[in-house]
Amino acid sequence: MVSDLSAYRGVEEEYSRSMILASITRQETIAPTRDLIHDLKQAGYKLYVLSNMSRDFIEYLRQQPVYEYFDGEVISCEEGVVKPMPQIYDILVERYGLDVSETMFIDDRIENVKVAEQIGITPFHFNREDAHSSCELLREMLLG
């Protein structure tokens, strides 16, 4: 990613890397999302990350306190496949022995949610523009 961005922008790779890292470290956890993740974990849910994150971003995220709540991960840059390719969902299901009929996939991109539904996983389209409402709906569905 760094070399592609550098070539595209016509700048040194070190400059691109520093700009990417600056962007990553400005990310903030959305409070309702963090709270929901905590509450789902406390209720006994197994939580997994299935993401198209860059290597730099996943390395940053793995150091964040919220990441301790996750039981496993499948990250596209480490697997060589990306969402919405069905293979990446299969990797998650097989690696962690998940039953698709008991699995929910939450994502902000409708194309990713549709593929999950096609393979038998319960889909939930998360609205990034209204994270609070999405979290409340998930809370009602999963925690009563």
Residue ranges: model-predicted function:
Residues 54-55, 61-144:
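Asp-based, Mg2+/Mn2+-dependent phosphohydrolase catalytic module
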Residues 1, 11-12, 39, 63, ...:
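General structural signal for secondary-structure boundaries
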Residues 26, 55-56:
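Short, catalytically relevant binding-site loops at active-site mouths
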Residues 29-33, 59, 109:
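Amphipathic coiled-coil/heptad-repeat helices and related helical stalk/stem segments
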Residues 2-3, 17-21, 58, 135, ...:
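Generic detector of well-ordered alpha-helical segments enriched in charged/polar residues
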Residues 3, 8-48, 86:
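Short, acidic loop-to-helix structural element flanking the phosphoryl-transfer center
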Residues 51:
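Conserved phosphate-coupling serine/threonine residues in phosphotransfer and NTP-handling enzymes
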